[in-house]
Amino acid sequence: MISNNRIFLVAIAVIGAVALSGLSVVAQQDDERPPMGVFITSVGVGNGANLGGLEGADAHCQRLASAAGAGDRTWRAYLSTQGPGAVNARDRIGDGPWANAVGLVMAANADSLHYDNSNFNWTYMRDENGNQFPSRIDGNPDFSEHDVLTGTQMDGAAFPAGDDRTCNNWTSDSGGSAMLGHADRYSFTTPGSSWNQAHPSRSCSQPDLVATGGAGRFYCFAID
């Protein structure tokens, strides 16, 4: 006859094996999860659209990514510039694919990103820490930070010289204007707004960015 003690020990061993198996699966899933390759900044630079040019914006991306444990990758801001030597945002973000901070692939490549075959929306867009951003569609209709600095047309190209759409190539915190995207893909409560070309900002100042539903945030992409 098998003793009760032996039955108990066998049961404990089985439970332990099942638990270890479960932990192994979780570890394997974590190992298979793609690394973060894109995020919306949790905070802006704090000086309106004066980001210190592309160099300053890239440095901000790198700092935030490093603080979130992703500093081993090279990060670039999704921003265009205008005028002589104009830069297209789509040309400075690598080839993809890009996953968010929780491992969901947001876009496979630049074409899927710019031709509306991506997961760029409020549900999936996260900051570098894996958090969502304030939006009117999250239950607080009076507060939103969905405006994102891009200075970019829907296809990822720079605007032609003329009307300022980059706040003097990201060096102005007063006069001028920047093209903004809607990170939640909503215009108030209406879906379908563009993530990178929704409307120009009132000006380049921090108060005006905040007044229309922003905080000086922008997108950051890993290029490697």
Predicted stretch roles:
Residues 1-12:
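Bacterial N-terminal signal peptides that target proteins for export
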